[in-house]
C-alpha cells in the first residue's frame, strides 16, 4: 500500500524581499574601509542585486548599489561582502545596514535592517588565539593531538598560542592539576575559553581559523628572563588597548623540549601497526601527517612542547 502526501502553500509572495542578518563586530582603521561578510535571507523569487544605506549612530549615508553578478534564485540565505567605511572619529559606533531595494525595486520585506558594532581604530592589531589541549602520556589517541598542535604552530607562528595540559593521569610526569577546564575525553581542546570543546585533529584547525578572523581589541607583549637562581622567571607585560574597557590578565609559563628516560615518559600510541584500537587498517589509509605513528610501536619516547 502506497502513501502520498501533497502539500500546497498559498498566499501572497513578494518577488523582491530580503532580510539582512545582524553581523556582529567589525574593526576598520580610520580613513579606510573593509569588506564585511553579511548574510542575506532571501524571501523572494530571485536575488541579483541590492541597494542599501549604512548609518552610523543613526546618521545614514548615501544609498549604494551592489550587483552580485548572478541570480541566487528562490529563497535561501546567502553571504555577500559589503564595504563598510570607518567612522570619522576613533571609538565605538552602532552601525545599521538597511536594504532599500532588491533587484532594482523597493524591498518588500517588513524587516529591512541589520545591526553591528563598528570599532574605528588607529591601527589594526594582529589576532592571536590560545589553544588549550587536554592530553596525557597514557592516552593512546593523543599523538594525533600533538601532531595537530605542531601543524598549527607551523601554519600560524606566534598567532597560535598552544598550551598542552597533561591532565589525564597523575602518573604522567608532566601532570598539571593547578587548574581544570573539565575535559571530558582526551585529546580535546578549547580555543580562547569559548565555543566549548573540540577535537584537536578533526575540528580544531577550522575553529582556530575562524577565531583568527575575529577582531583583536587589545595586544599583549610579553618579555621574560631567568632570575639569577634559574628557578624563577621575571616577566613583564605591556598592554595596548584600542578601546576602553575593564580587562583581566591571566598568564601561564610553558616549556618546550621536555624529555625523560623512565617509562612514564613514554607516549602511548594506538595508531601503531596491529593495535586493536587503531581506527586505520593500513598505513596508507592514514592521513599523511600521522603515518609515522604506524611504525612507532604501542609506546615511544616523545619530546613534549607547550607544556
Enumerate the language-model features and the residues they cover.
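Local sequence-structure signature of Cys/Sec-based thiol-disulfide redox active-site neighborhoods
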Residues: 121-160
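A short beta-turn/strand-edge loop motif at beta-sheet boundaries
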Residues: 29, 42-49, 240-247
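Short, solvent-exposed loop/linker segments at the N-terminal edge
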Residues: 25-33, 224-230
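Short strand-edge motifs at loop-to-beta-strand transitions and within beta-strands
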Residues: 76-82, 288
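Short, surface-exposed loop/turn segments at beta-strand-coil junctions that are enriched for proline
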Residues: 85-91
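Proline/serine/threonine-rich low-complexity linkers at boundaries of modular beta-sandwich domains
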Residues: 5-19, 206-217
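Short, conserved sequence motifs used for protein processing/export or organelle targeting and
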Residues: 65-67, 158-307
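Proline-enriched interdomain boundary motifs that mark the N-terminal boundary
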Residues: 13-24, 62-63, 128-130, 217-222
Amino acid at each position: 500500500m502506497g502513501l502520498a502526501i501533497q502539500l500546497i502553500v498559498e498566499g501572497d509572495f513578494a518577488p523582491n524581499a530580503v532580510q539582512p542578518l545582524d553581523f556582529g563586530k567589525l574593526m576598520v582603521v580610520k580613513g579606510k574601509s573593509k569588506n564585511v561578510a553579511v548574510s542575506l535571507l532571501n524571501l523572494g523569487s530571485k536575488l541579483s542585486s541590492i541597494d542599501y544605506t549604512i548609518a552610523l549612530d543613526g546618521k545614514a549615508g548615501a544609498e549604494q548599489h551592489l550587483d552580485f553578478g548572478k541570480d541566487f534564485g528562490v529563497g535561501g540565505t546567502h553571504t555577500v561582502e559589503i564595504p563598510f567605511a570607518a567612522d570619522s572619529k576613533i571609538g565605538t559606533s552602532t552601525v545599521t545596514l538597511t536594504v532599500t531595494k532588491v533587484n532594482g525595486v523597493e524591498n518588500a520585506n517588513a524587516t529591512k535592517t541589520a545591526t553591528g558594532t563598528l570599532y574605528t581604530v588607529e591601527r589594526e592589531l594582529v589576532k592571536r588565539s590560545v589553544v588549550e589541549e587536554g592530553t596525557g602520556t597514557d592516552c593512546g589517541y593523543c599523538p594525533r593531538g600533538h601532531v595537530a598542535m605542531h601543524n598549527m604552530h607551523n601554519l600560524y607562528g606566534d598567532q597560535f598560542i598552544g598550551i598542552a595540559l597533561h591532565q589525564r593521569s597523575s602518573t604522567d610526569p608532566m601532570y598539571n592539576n593547578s587548574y581544570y577546564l573539565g575535559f571530558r575525553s582526551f585529546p580535546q581542546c578549547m580555543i580562547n575559553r569559548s565555543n566549548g570543546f573540540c577535537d584537536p585533529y578533526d575540528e580544531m584547525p577550522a575553529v582556530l581559523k575562524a577565531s583568527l578572523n575575529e577582531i583583536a581589541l587589545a595586544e599583549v607583549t610579553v618579555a621574560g628572563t631567568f632570575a639569577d637562581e634559574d628557578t624563577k622567571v621575571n616577566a613583564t607585560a605591556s598592554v595596548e588597548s584600542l578601546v576602553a574597557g575593564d580587562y583581566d590578565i591571566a598568564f601561564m609559563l610553558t616549556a618546550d623540549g621536555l624529555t625523560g628516560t623512565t617509562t612514564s615518559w613514554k607516549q602511548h600510541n594506538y595508531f601503531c601497526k596491529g593495535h586493536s584500537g587503531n581506527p586505520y587498517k593500513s598505513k596508507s589509509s592514514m592521513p599523511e601527517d600521522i603515518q609515522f605513528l604506524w611504525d612507532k610501536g604501542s609506546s615511544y619516547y616523545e619530546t613534549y612542547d607547550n607544556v
